[in-house]
Amino acid sequence: MSSVYDWFQERLEIQAIADDITSKYVPPHVNIFYCLGGITLTCFIVQVATGFAMTFYYRPTVTEAFASVEYLMTEVNFGWLIRSVHRWSASMMVLNMILHVCRVYLTGGFKKPRELTWVTGVLLASVTVSFGVTGYSLPWDQVGYWACKIVTGVPDAVPIVGGLIVQVLRGGVSVGQSTLTRFYSAHTFVLPVVAAVLMLTHFVMIRKQGISGPL
């Protein structure tokens, strides 16, 4: 085992990396509320894992979406559990994100020199809301359909470009197959990639600047 370790150590200097990770100073004022960001990340990882599992059975078409979800819930082994965990972790992710934002705001974690960390956090909050909006409509039941119709219709109130935004979101004038395809692509590919990039940036800045001081 030591020879394997030495082989990697010689090429990657893994001991220096391990020392840097484990020797980071943690201020004495840090308490359990400073873990809310990490809990949100954990919920996101659970979302990715369970969401990936569901893609094997979900069919993003207006004629088969609901039936595929029903099949997952009733016929697939532990399918009901996978979807339930996905839904529960989504709710927990939103709740912990809100609490995390409140903690950062109340402790002044957004102040200089951590303004950019705050900006990436706000962008992550927007992405999280977008996850909820796009995922809610994927079963394509009555609730999902009308939620999709209402949400995509909101930009219509924007002067001049409102109608164009609505058509881009829906893939046409009305809600249909193109809308579901857009929501599915955004929920399973675009948003996860954007979230991962923002999270990496967020964590790198936290690692560089450290945790903010007490009030």
Swiss-Prot record:
Sequence positions that bind heme b 1: 100, 202
Binding site for heme c: 35
GO biological process: photosynthesis; respiratory electron transport chain
UniProt topology in membrane: Multi-pass membrane protein
Keywords: Chloroplast, Electron transport, Heme, Iron, Membrane, Metal-binding, Photosynthesis, Plastid, Thylakoid, Transmembrane, Transmembrane helix, Transport
GO CC annotation terms, alphabetical: chloroplast thylakoid membrane
Gene Ontology terms, MF aspect: electron transporter, transferring electrons within cytochrome b6/f complex of photosystem II activity; metal ion binding; oxidoreductase activity
Localisation per UniProt entry: Plastid, Chloroplast thylakoid membrane
Residues involved in heme b 2 binding: 86, 187
KW tRNA processing (keyword) present: no
Pfam family name, one: Cytochrome_B
InterPro entries in the cross-refs: Cyt_b/b6_N, Cyt_B6_PetB, Cytb/b6-like_sf, Cytochrome_b_N_euk/bac, Di-haem_cyt_TM
CC cofactor: heme b; heme c
Residues spanning the membrane: 32-52, 90-110, 116-136, 186-206
Cofactor binding, per record: Binds 2 heme b groups non-covalently with two histidine residues as axial ligands.
Main location: plastid
Family classification: Belongs to the cytochrome b family. PetB subfamily.
Subunit text: The 4 large subunits of the cytochrome b6-f complex are cytochrome b6, subunit IV (17 kDa polypeptide, PetD), cytochrome f and the Rieske protein, while the 4 small subunits are PetG, PetL, PetM and PetN. The complex functions as a dimer.
NCBIfam families found in the cross-reference section: PRK03735.1
Function: Component of the cytochrome b6-f complex, which mediates electron transfer between photosystem II (PSII) and photosystem I (PSI), cyclic electron flow around PSI, and state transitions.
Note: Heme 1 (or BH or b566) is high-potential and absorbs at about 566 nm, and heme 2 (or BL or b562) is low-potential and absorbs at about 562 nm.
Name of the featured protein: Cytochrome b6
Source organism of this protein record: Emiliania huxleyi (Coccolithophore)
Gene expressing this chain: petB
